[in-house]
A protein has these predicted regions:
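P-loop NTPase motor domains
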Residues: 2-19, 26-28, 33-41, 46-307, ...
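Short beta-strand elements
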Residues: 23, 228-229, 383-388
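C-terminal regions of RecA-like/P-loop NTPase motor modules
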Residues: 1-8, 316-390
Length: 390
C-alpha cells in the first residue's frame, strides 16, 4: 500500500472557545519535531501516538528506544497488515536475527562524512579515554575499513594486531593519505608509542565486542539491517537498546551509530527524484545520548530527502551548546512539556516570551506549549493537550 498523505494528529487546542484537534502534515514534519519535558510528563505517550499513526498511514519509520518499554508497546500494536514490514532489533535477545554494520555499504563519496560520524559517536561515549593520538590512529583505521567491501568493527582491532591483514587492506586503498599513514607513518612508530596510542581503543572496543550478543549484532548477524532500503521500501525499524542490560556505554554507542547511519542513508537519496523519495520518520527517545554535532548539523539537510526526525529528551542542558543551537535552529516544530527552571527560562525566550517561565514550570501532565510548523511556516506559540495513543 502506498503511504497516505494524512496529517499526524497529536493534540487538542487548550482553549474554552477552541477545542480543535490538530497535527502535522508529512511535508511539515520534514522540518523535524523537537520534544522536551521532565520525566513522567507525557513525552512517551506523545511519541507513541505519532508513530502508531505513521504505521497506520503506511509510512516507513524507525524508533530508537534506549530502554525498550516504548518499542515493546509499539511492537504489540503494529497494524496486522504491516507486520511483515517490521525489523525488530531487540538487542538483549540472543535469538533475534538482525544486526547492523556501520562500516558496510558506504558509498565512496560519503566515506569522509561516515568516518566523521563514527568517530564523533565513539568520542562521545569514550570521552574519558580519548586523546589526540588515539583519535589520529582510529580515524585512519576507520577510513581504511570504510573502503573495504565487508569490513566490520572487529577489523579495527585486526588493523593493529594482524600485519598481513593490515597489508592487504592498505594495498587496496584509494585514498593516498590513508595509505601513506599505514605504509609509512604507522610502521615507523616505536612499540611503546604504538601501544600507548592503541591501548584505549583495544580496551573500549574490546569490551564492547566481548559481549557475544553485541558482537553478533555488529559483526555477524543472520540478517543485516539496510537502512536505505528500509527507507525506500517504507519498512518499520524498532530498536530496543536495553541500556539497563547491556550497559550505558554500549547502548549509547550503538544508538549513536544507528542515528548517524540514518542520516547518511537519507542523504544517499540525492540520486533519487524528489517525488520518489518515500517519507520516512525517525524517532529518538533520550536524544541526548545518541546525538553528535555531525547528527545535529544533518537536520538542515534531511528535509530535502523526505526524512523527518522526532527527537525527545528531558533537559536542554543535556546537549552541548553547539548541538543545542543546531537542533533548535533546525526544528520546525518545538513541543514543551513541563520543564525545570533553567530550561523554562531558555524555552520562554525560544517562544519569543509569548509563553512565560511560570507557564512552562506549571504545566500539568500531557499538557504542552508548542510552535507548530504549518505549510512551511512556524505558528505562534500556543497551549494544547496531547491525545492518548489509540
Amino acid at each position: 500500500m502506498a503511504p497516505q498523505n494524512f496529517p499526524t494528529l497529536f493534540g487538542r487546542v487548550a482553549s474554552r472557545s477552541d477545542r480543535r484537534v490538530f497535527g502535522l502534515r508529512p511535508t511539515d514534519r520534514f522540518s523535524h519535531v523537537y520534544v522536551i519535558g521532565k520525566t513522567g510528563t507525557g513525552k512517551s505517550s506523545l511519541l507513541e501516538t505519532m508513530v502508531l499513526q505513521d504505521m497506520a498511514h503506511g509510512h516507513g519509520v524507525a524508533f530508537i528506544d534506549p530502554h525498550g518499554d516504548i518499542v515493546t508497546r509499539i511492537h504489540d500494536r503494529v497494524p496486522p497488515w504491516r507486520r511483515g514490514d517490521i525489523r525488530y532489533l531487540n538487542v538483549p535477545d540472543a535469538e533475534q536475527p538482525f544486526g547492523y554494520n556501520p562500516l558496510r555499504r558506504v558509498r565512496h563519496e560519503r566515506i569522509p562524512l561516515a568516518a566523521s560520524g563514527i568517530l564523533e559517536a565513539m568520542k562521545k561515549v569514550w570521552g574519558d579515554a580519548w586523546g589526540v593520538r588515539m583519535e589520529h590512529i582510529l580515524r585512519n583505521a576507520v577510513f581504511a575499513l570504510l573502503e573495504q567491501k565487508n569490513a566490520a568493527l572487529s577489523d579495527i582491532l585486526r588493523m593493529f594486531s594482524d600485519k598481513a591483514f593490515r597489508k592487504e587492506v592498505t594495498q587496496s586503498l584509494r585514498n593516498p593519505t590513508i595509505r601513506t599513514f599505514w605504509e609509512k607513518e604507522y610502521e615507523r612508530y616505536s612499540f611503546g608509542y604504538r601501544a600507548d596510542g592503541i591501548a584505549s581503543i583495544q580496551n573500549k572496543l574490546g569490551a564492547l565486542l566481548s559481549d557475544p550478543t553485541l558482537r553478533r549484532i555488529l559483526t555477524a548477524p543472520k540478517e543485516d539491517i539496510r537502512i536505505r532500503a528500509m527507507m525506500d521500501e517504507g519498512r518499520i525499524l524498532l530498536v530496543n537498546l536495553a541500556k539497563g542490560q547491556v550497559g550505558e556505554d554500549s547502548a549509547s554507542l550503538l544508538g549513536a551509530l544507528l542515528v548517524t547511519t540514518v542520516g547518511l542513508a537519507a542523504m544517499s537519496r540525492a540520486e533519487v527524484e524528489q517525488s520518489d523519495r518515500r517519507p520516512f520518520f525517525c524517532y529518538i527517545d533520550e536524544f541526548q545520548s545518541f546525538t553528535t554535532l555531525s547528527v545535529a548539523n544533518m537536520f538542515s539537510e534531511l528535509r530535502k530527502y523526505n526524512v523527518g526526525m522526532v527527537a525527545a529528551h528531558q533537559y536542554l542542558y543535556q546537549l552541548e551548546s553547539d548541538i543545542r543551537h543546531a537542533v533548535l535552529g533546525n526544528s520546525g516544530t518545538v513541543i514543551s512539556f513541563r520543564l525545570g527552571a533553567e530550561d523554562a527560562a531558555y524555552l520562554s525566550r525560544e517562544f519569543g516570551q509569548v509563553v512565560s517561565e511560570r507557564d512552562l514550570l506549571n504545566l500539568a501532565n500531557h499538557h504542552i506549549y508548542l510552535k507548530l510548523m504549518i505549510d512551511g511556516m512556524p505558528s505562534k506559540p500556543f497551549s494544547a493537550e496531547t491525545l492518548a495513543p489509540t
